């Protein structure tokens, strides 16, 4: 899930993660009622999961790379292994951005149309989206939550969260020529070592109660910062796509 990365790179193999990470803090139960747990299957019928967030009663936003078959969304969850008063709803239409690029991770955003409208209550609520002119600035500290993987390679049963600092785009550009600050966010202060982990993809980066980013990917070095999708750059696409999905 949320990882504190220690400086052991010099003494560990490149792909080793187990000895260098511990995870973040458990969220207060149901304190993030917009969160969605998304389960789906790949072409080999292997199960996967991502995070997402409710942006309308019948629409969940997530990352485009979280697309698959037989997608189901669980709303109102805290511990996904316990019996809770959740709403499990099938997805009838997944609409990833038509220009999503698996290699560069550009346009890593997707909307899911739910089979039925969610019942909003104390543990299930929508979250606000930014205006197209909103711009998250370097130095701003916002929060990510998710059910991502822990240090022992198991996924977290309970929702975890961490505060992460927005970095200057140049930090990510120096590490990857594919980074594009106009549509992406560079997130995570290397000196603090806090980060998202596998399984947190698709979750929201929340600043002052507004979903400003989507957890997208980590750079090829495996180190901080991470790259998130910048939601404000996609508002026209979101509005158009939501209208089409809700009319279908």
From Swiss-Prot:
Tissue spec: Mast cells.
Glycosylation sites: 67, 152, 180
Major subcellular site: secreted
Location of the protein in the cell: Secreted; Cytoplasmic granule
A Pfam family annotated for this UniProt entry: Trypsin
One GO cellular component, as annotated: extracellular space
Gene3D superfamilies named in the record: Trypsin-like serine proteases (2.40.10.10)
CDD domains, A to Z: Tryp_SPc (cd00190)
Single GO MF descriptor: serine-type endopeptidase activity
Family: Belongs to the peptidase S1 family. Granzyme subfamily.
Protein known as: Mast cell protease 8
Organism: Rattus norvegicus
Upper classification of the organism: Eukaryota, Metazoa, Chordata, Craniata, Vertebrata
Gene: Mcpt8
């Amino acid at each position: 899930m949320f990882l504190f990365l220690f400086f052991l790179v010099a003494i560990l193999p490149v792909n080793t993660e187990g000895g260098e990470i511990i995870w973040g803090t458990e969220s207060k139960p149901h304190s993030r009622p917009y969160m969605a747990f998304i389960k789906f299957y790949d072409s080999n019928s292997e199960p996967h999961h991502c995070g997402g967030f409710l942006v309308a009663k019948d629409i969940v936003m997530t990352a485009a790379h979280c697309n698959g078959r037989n997608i189901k969304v669980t709303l109102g969850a805290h511990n996904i292994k316990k019996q809770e008063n959740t709403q499990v709803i099938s997805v009838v239409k997944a609409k990833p951005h038509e220009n999503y690029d698996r290699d560069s991770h550009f346009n890593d955003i997707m909307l899911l149309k739910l089979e039925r409208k969610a019942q909003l209550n104390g543990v299930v609520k929508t979250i606000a989206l930014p205006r197209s002119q909103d711009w998250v600035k370097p130095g701003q500290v916002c929060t990510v939550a998710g059910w991502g993987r822990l240090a022992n390679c198991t996924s977290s049963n309970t929702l975890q969260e961490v505060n992460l600092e927005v970095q200057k785009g140049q930090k990510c550009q120096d590490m990857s020529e594919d980074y594009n600050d106009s549509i992406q966010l560079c997130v995570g202060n290397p000196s603090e070592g806090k980060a998202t982990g596998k399984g947190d993809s698709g979750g929201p980066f929340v600043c002052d109660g507004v979903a400003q980013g989507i957890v997208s990917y980590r750079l090829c070095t495996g180190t901080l910062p991470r790259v998130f999708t910048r939601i404000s750059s996609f508002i026209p696409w979101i509005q158009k796509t939501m209208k089409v999905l809700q009319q279908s």
